[in-house]
Amino acid sequence: KEGKGVRSILFFLPEKIQDAKIVNYLVKVENPLPGYDIGLVCSEKSKIFYPHIDNVKLFTFNDEDLNYFDTIKSLSFMSQIKNKSYDAIVDLNTGFCAATTMLAFELNAPLKIGFDSTVNRKIFTITLERKENTFLESYFSRILSLLGAKL
């Protein structure tokens, strides 16, 4: 975006509770990043991991929105998200998640950040290699740094 950085970010929230605890702390869902237009995507099942998301734009999908391959088939869900154009998409799932990976593929954003996998290398502009002995906090801090955001 002409070197001005990102102003709007769509975060795909993790489906695993252990990752959700860290994301709640780092992304400060109770108090979203000041000065940024934030959107969040998660499944209805994982929504319970994020108790303080009333004050941000939240998109949730359920099992009926998914097809046989666990990717999003719901046109109404897709059109809700496509109503807004985001500068960046960040998938915070540390493992492969078919629904969010294919959603990232479908959406047009100049910057897409996710964790490394064979599929994600084709879809995301930046992938972060997950190392078992590295704390998740350092990855999330790096993501915010790549976005030009500060905690």
Locate the predicted segments by residue.
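Structural motif
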Residues: 8, 12-16, 42-44, 88-90, 92-94
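Short, charged/polar "capping" segments at the starts of alpha-helices
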Residues: 18-20, 46-51, 122
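Short internal beta-strands
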Residues: 36-48, 115
